[in-house]
């Protein structure tokens, strides 16, 4: 499907005169109010207008419309209760089984199960639920919901939702399922673009032993294969503990990242252990050492021809696929609108203001000065990923890898230890076993992810990367994060009062709760005992991390706005625009601290390419996570508070946070704690 093939959706007036429909609605309203009483007048009027908003000529003529309304309006509370319960139960089954099929179809692509064949990619890109919304409008189940339950605006949910009952919130979420009427072919096109971008990102590995410097030295060990951007970034972090070669490694990784972002990286070095590459000069030669069992392709020319803007061509494909849904979403006519007003339920302007509040805080140069004093040198751009505030930085990667590989040689070994890990996090033994019994652990092809369930009878899946030598620190750190997702997924589905309220307000909350777990990774290994200084250091780490990812999010937001402003852009034009946006963002928020201009490093995030404007969830998640962690500290533990919060369900972000912590979402808690942490830690290295 091309963009030109998408036209504005037809309305009922295209085949039925507006006068006819207006007259029919007037008569129906009077008839139903007379039948069910004045107490139903508001519901009748609202329901009729909601149905009319989506009714199309193919749905039937005036007589069909009248017959449908008379047959399906629930005019008393008992009938409405039966309808609500039935839809809730059956939609859980539908969602659950569709999700189960999708998971199975994606397994070869998502899991470390050998080569991905062309047909595997087709299976992975197929969305069995793509036609469901279309079907529900065709069979008029969607219209039944719209006739009986309220569609609401974000403003109404924010301002009126404070006084709603849990049942009212569940009804609101039920109606929201049918707030758009997007054709199945559009949903399929979006799923296909998402699958293609996932494949591109999941295969973007760099063989680190084959990076050489000007002297031909290899700084990284054999067989090290790092996925961009996650593993490259994390290797920068662990290198702070390497007093001999850490700085050289970090500078080299920065060069690699910049080559990827600018697309000057030689195509031949991507996922290829058979060539050596000097990122500084961009020289490529046949490998002079071998650290893989794979065989080099015959007759492959070893040249440094750059990747042909594939990174930005892939991003453009996701934009053009997402844009196909725009005409069918009149209240949120761009992906940007849908992400903020529907998915996050926090206005974009408010998100931007919160991020700006952190990035321009006078605390930033104070923390930067402290980092410089600890490093004993001026900051360099890659120090945006400084992690020396974390207690674990005193351990080398090799020490952590050895400890973890021995403890978790397989995915099954990690699964068996989940109850113990949850008990260490403060969950009562019974609840730890309850959650662990509902988690399946799979070896991931990529960096790892958590796949929830959509019905209570299904288990959630934790996907983590397991090397042949066993789990390493990077894999463990990600696994703990994904385990946080999994526990939230279990509690917010199995223990919430209405399954229609399954989940949390938005994915920033999902990330926030996962960060709570991830921040305890070293404690789970028995390597850190929290005290006042450690807590202050963790606060500084959270603040610096939010400073970093906040800029990344602003780049992601600006790039999507640019694509909407330039719908006919080429990959090369998008590349140049992204680089300029990255430079402008760096120059505004980071040059005053780092003293260097026009740095493009923050555009390295793979999420920018395959995640459809997901990145703002991370800094919002950091702010939310900090508020949540502060509450857990006040309460004296993670487990019970985590469970209380996770079962609040999918209400608006501020309402959820008010119930969880007593205050709305904001940056103030992090900024206040950072100020106190600076006083606690001082300027001592």
What are these regions (language model features)?
Residues 485, 511-519, 549-557, 580, ...:
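Feature representing long, continuous alpha-helical segments
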Residues 4-291, 322-395, 568-685:
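C-terminal, non-catalytic "cap/extension" segments appended to globular domains
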Residues 409, 449-450, 466-478, 500-509, ...:
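Alpha-helix capping and helix-loop boundary segments enriched in small/acidic/polar residues
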Residues 323, 491-544, 621, 628, ...:
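Post-HExxH zinc-binding segment in Zn-dependent metallohydrolases
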Residues 285-459:
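Contiguous, non-catalytic segments that form substrate-binding/exosite surfaces or channel walls
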